[in-house]
């Protein structure tokens, strides 16, 4: 990535404030969706589906932190508008996941997700708008595939139909985020940025595996 000096960020957007928030504070800041459709209790779901949903919750939690990391660092008005809009959507997703997945069913790695998510947003923001857009495209490309793998295992009819629809709706938002980022990103990227995006993709895959197990 070609380094450019970031423009001054608003005094209120201090990185420490975002990193120091507890998991509960992050969850409480998300809008209360109240929109999760009726579905079987989490404990009654198949084990594989519980694990997938645990990774989904962790992913939405991490997504909130990615955009907070961007907003904490970037002073670019277009980047901030982009991140703020996406953040609101990710907060809604997180609120939905909080309704579906009880605290006992969530990964114990959320403190790590908080830090790593924030850094995934903050680091590219140091290098400018193109690094941010490329990063989001990489993240959302992975998320699209991750949701699709779950959706194809669930049928629209039956007891898991409402839950499947939640995943379909979340996936549609993530695809929209990916496409928007791709439309704003330049197709030609230097070696460092390509490597960074590869790390982001592989890191996302590793995070899913960890969230399912811990």
Annotated model-derived regions:
Residues 2-214:
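Non-heme di-metal
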């Amino acid at each position: 990535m070609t380094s450019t000096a970031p423009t001054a960020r608003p005094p209120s957007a201090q990185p420490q404030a975002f990193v120091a928030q507890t998991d509960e504070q992050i969850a409480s800041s998300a809008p209360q969706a109240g929109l999760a459709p009726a579905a079987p209790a989490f404990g009654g779901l198949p084990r594989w589906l519980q694990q997938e949903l645990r990774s989904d919750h962790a992913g939405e939690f991490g997504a909130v932190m990615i955009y907070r990391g961007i907003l904490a660092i970037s002073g670019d008005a277009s980047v901030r508008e982009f991140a703020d809009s996406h953040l609101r959507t990710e907060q809604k997703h997180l609120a939905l996941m909080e309704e579906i997945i009880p605290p006992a069913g969530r990964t114990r790695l959320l403190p790590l997700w908080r830090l790593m998510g924030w850094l995934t947003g903050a680091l590219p923001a140091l290098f400018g708008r193109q690094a941010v857009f490329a990063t989001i495209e990489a993240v959302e490309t992975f998320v699209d595939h991750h949701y699709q793998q779950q959706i194809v295992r669930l049928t629209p009819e039956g007891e898991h139909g409402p839950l499947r629809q939640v995943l379909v709706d979340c996936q549609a938002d993530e695809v929209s985020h990916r496409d928007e980022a791709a439309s704003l990103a330049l197709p030609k990227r230097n070696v460092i940025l390509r490597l960074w995006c590869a790390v982001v993709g592989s890191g996302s895959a590793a995070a899913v595996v960890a969230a399912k197990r811990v």
